[in-house]
């Protein structure tokens, strides 16, 4: 959520930043709604003060009867009625909060202006892409290996699901353990095993609700399946005040994730690129406003390390204003090279959300010896999605005979297995 005080004091800049997100100017409407809310709040405070004064006089009166006493009683009763009506009006006046809840985060000054991914800015590349490399797509390879099943799975769960078998299931498990080990041992992240069912308020805190309600799966009794472990991890500090010396806090978690893929009809209908259920290792950092820029580079580099150790070619893109996620003020996308598609595809998003999520969930910190609190900054990064990493390994490590060479760093995690070959039932 955006800071209403900042909007109040920076109307023109607010409208300019909204325009960078391709949203029409809204400062005038917000000023009107904010003024109305502040007027009601001011009246409530005045009546509360008047009630306090009159109640004190009543309490100090020697005689608890008579015209003066009864007149004061009537005044207090009238004030209570006014207060009840004003408080009801304030509670019913949700338009301002509803409007603020629909605004995305304000873009950082370094974010390039642009409408879509064509305007994203290349930051760096890693590894070489070979235009003459073997170029079967991952699902062709997986099906031929008899270790990736879409057909039978569709009978169980429908489309956009997959069943991995044998050594591909083992590769999935190996990647999870490898990624968690790298992030905990080399990058100082603390491992968490969080719930994957959360309440709506947790989704709201993370910026998933109300705007993206249709993109998650909801149960019939008030829970939602997480679209990313970011939801569970950032809420670890909801409604808390953290001592400054404990920051940064860095969490890593592997969880299954669930997305309805609303609006993705016709996109990536084959294979493992876009599934309703997928596994992902997620990174979350909680830090101070002064350190969040450096922490953004840190968390991005942690994600990149996984691909570097797997020797997979990738590039890092700085997203433009029109391509950034709702809660982010600045985002790097890491895109992996897929020979089967002959293009780079997103494998990770690494975002600095500033105090956007913290304001929603009241996550604060304070200096030692001080009573003053400040909103933390939250950051998140994919570290990485297991399925898309497997896709990249299958396509970049494929051999002429259809077998898959295991990357060196995964051999021990695979129990010494160096190559995945076709499974014969």
UniProtKB/Swiss-Prot annotation:
EC number assigned by the record: 6.1.1.11
Pfam families (UniProt xref): Seryl_tRNA_N, tRNA-synt_2b
GO cellular component: cytoplasm
Keyword list, A-Z: Aminoacyl-tRNA synthetase, ATP-binding, Cytoplasm, Ligase, Nucleotide-binding, Protein biosynthesis
Superkingdom assignment: Bacteria
Binding site for L-serine: 228-230, 282, 382
Record's subcellular location: Cytoplasm
BP terms from Gene Ontology: selenocysteine biosynthetic process; seryl-tRNA aminoacylation
GO MF assignments: ATP binding; serine-tRNA ligase activity
Binding positions for ATP per the UniProt entry: 259-261, 346-349
Family matches, as HAMAP family: Ser_tRNA_synth_type1
Similarity comment text for this entry: Belongs to the class-II aminoacyl-tRNA synthetase family. Type-1 seryl-tRNA synthetase subfamily.
Free-text function comment from the UniProt entry: Catalyzes the attachment of serine to tRNA(Ser). Is also able to aminoacylate tRNA(Sec) with serine, to form the misacylated tRNA L-seryl-tRNA(Sec), which will be further converted into selenocysteinyl-tRNA(Sec).
Quaternary assembly: Homodimer. The tRNA molecule binds across the dimer.
Domain notes: Consists of two distinct domains, a catalytic core and a N-terminal extension that is involved in tRNA binding.
Name the UniProt record assigns to this protein: Serine--tRNA ligase
